[in-house]
Amino acid sequence: MRRFPSIKARRMLRILRSNPLNYIASRNSRGSHLMLVSHGRQPILFYYHPKVEISGRIVREMLVEKAGLTEEQAWNLIH
């Protein structure tokens, strides 16, 4: 298992919204809490504070466990 780097929340949101993930915020999102949905993937509840660092463990959890990517695909998205 790879050790994923911590990244800024703004960058993580950009990754989740880009290809191949294509997550979008659902209409009932409020404030800094975004419910991100994508066809064929689990929804992700994202706490968006743009300058906050997201730990590598959470980055891996979002991309591998929630979004359904392999570790290799997730690693390539963030590098």
Model regions and ranges:
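General helical structural elements
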Residues: 6, 14-15, 34, 61-64
